[in-house]
């Protein structure tokens, strides 16, 4: 029997980063993908004009009238890939993330039986592993990862206890099961999209990929990490052991509210004992914000209240007012 090549739809979410988007779209159109779906989150930098000038039958552009954030953009794009393109597999990425040359061929060459999703190995353009996209095994579900995390915490290296190691990225390393993979180079089967549904657009930014993939795993879907499928992430965002300093300040709200949402899924019955530890750690971050330390604490407190209540209905305009920000 002849083997049928699975169709692949690529979903890219963009907002006012035309310089990044042009590289990503060119990279995608140079690889054997069947559909390229670009969700333009109300960009004002000429993105719409540039996209309208492209002439490739594989390209489908959805322009939102408002910025829906990454979560809203991925929700729209994944729905289009599932329901309109009806692709066998959908791969998602930000506008600054893109498949390395040969990545799609490497994915097609895989034995995909038994996997509902595949996460790529994400690197910076200079070859360094991109920390913010490093997959992990949930330590609350994996005793080995839990013990490794506890052992490394006194050394300030708890994160290394449950995230994949550098050796797992080496060429020839096996595909490994993981519980979380980011929305940069995550391939989702049609069955996974039908079973797991779509990301919640109310998350706006941050943590949508963690929450989505953790919920996939909790539903029994299998996610693999494939080191041979390589993606580039052209980002300057810094991810250190202590986390990031977020600007503009409205981003603080989404980071910590959504983190609590993800911790609730990950920790299960351990969530409430974990909350005081998280709050103590997070409030210490105020010192990193200098003259904005008091504002950081105000935003954090509201984020925590909403996160603990499971509240996702606060409008973006309300969050902008809370953070005294004019950013969209």
Name these PLM-found stretches.
Residues 26-35:
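Short, acidic, metal-binding catalytic loop of nucleotide-sugar glycosyltransferases
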Residues 40-49, 66, 97-100:
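A conserved acidic beta->alpha catalytic loop
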Residues 176, 214, 218-301, 309:
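Active-site-adjacent helix/loop segment of glycosyltransferases
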């Amino acid at each position: 029997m002849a083997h049928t090549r699975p169709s692949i739809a690529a979903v890219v979410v963009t907002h006012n980063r035309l310089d990044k988007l042009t590289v990503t779209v060119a990279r995608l159109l140079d690889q054997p993908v069947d559909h390229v779906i670009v969700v333009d989150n109300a960009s004002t930098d000429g993105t719409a004009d540039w996209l309208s000038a492209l002439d490739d039958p594989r390209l489908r552009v959805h322009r939102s009238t408002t910025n829906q954030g990454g979560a809203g953009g991925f929700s729209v794009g994944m729905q289009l890939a599932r329901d309109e393109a009806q692709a066998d597999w959908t791969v998602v990425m930000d506008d600054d993330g893109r498949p390395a040359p040969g990545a799609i061929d490497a994915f097609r060459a895989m034995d995909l039986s038994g996997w509902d999703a595949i996460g790529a190995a994400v690197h910076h353009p200079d070859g360094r592993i991109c920390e913010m996209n490093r997959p992990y095994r949930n330590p609350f579900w994996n005793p080995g990862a839990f013990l490794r995390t506890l052992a490394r915490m006194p050394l300030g290296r708890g994160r290394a206890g449950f995230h994949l190691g550098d050796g797992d990225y080496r060429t020839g390393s096996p595909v490994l099961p993981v519980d979380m993979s980011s929305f940069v180079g995550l391939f989702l089967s049609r069955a996974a999209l039908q079973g797991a549904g779509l990301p919640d657009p109310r998350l706006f930014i941050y943590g949508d990929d963690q929450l989505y993939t953790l919920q996939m795993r909790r539903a029994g879907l299998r996610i693999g990490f494939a080191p041979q499928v390589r993606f580039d992430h052209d980002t300057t965002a810094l991810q250190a052991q202590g986390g990031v300093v977020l600007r503009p300040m409205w981003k603080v709200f989404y980071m910590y509210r959504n983190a609590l949402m993800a911790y609730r899924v990950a920790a299960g019955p351990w969530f409430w004992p974990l909350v005081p530890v998280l709050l103590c750690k997070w409030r210490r971050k105020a010192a990193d914000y200098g003259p904005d330390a008091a504002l950081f604490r105000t935003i954090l407190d509201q984020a925590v209240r909403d996160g603990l209540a499971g509240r996702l209905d606060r409008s973006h305009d309300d969050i902008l007012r809370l953070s005294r920000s004019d950013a969209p």
